[in-house]
Design a protein with these regions (language model features):
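A charged, well-structured terminal subsegment
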Residues: 75-91
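Short, acidic/small-residue loops that bind anionic groups at enzyme active sites
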Residues: 35-62
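Short beta->alpha junction loops
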Residues: 1-4, 62
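Glycine- and acidic-rich phosphate- and metal-coordinating loops
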Residues: 22-26, 57-64
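Generic secondary-structure signature for well-ordered alpha-helical cores
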Residues: 15, 46, 50-54, 85-90
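Charged/polar, solvent-exposed surface patches and flexible loops
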Residues: 8, 71, 86
Length: 91
């Protein structure tokens, strides 16, 4: 599965957990596909979070190339997990 499938996996498990961390990488190619996948995945994750009232840390990185992806992936998962924990601790 790719980043586009993350929302459906979260949706299927939404009642099992208090929060989620979505991790993935979308690297821009030569077609508009990147824009469609990036936006639709982000929108779906946000809607799941709002509708379920559960935090979903968005650790899906969008980059122009693999080099950027490697750099951004070093901290993005930790940041997304910390965001989820912060919401769970404060609400």
């Amino acid at each position: 599965p790719g980043s586009f499938e993350i929302p459906v996996v979260i949706s299927k498990n939404i009642k099992k957990y208090d929060g989620f961390v979505a991790l993935g990488s979308i690297i821009k190619g030569e077609t508009p596909h990147f824009d469609f996948i990036s936006q639709s995945t982000t929108d779906a994750i946000m809607q799941l979070s709002i509708n379920s009232k559960k935090p979903i840390g968005n650790g899906i990185i969008t980059t122009l190339n693999k080099k950027q992806a490697k750099i951004r992936s070093l901290t993005k998962g930790k940041e997304a997990a910390q965001a989820v924990l912060s919401v769970l601790d404060n609400f």
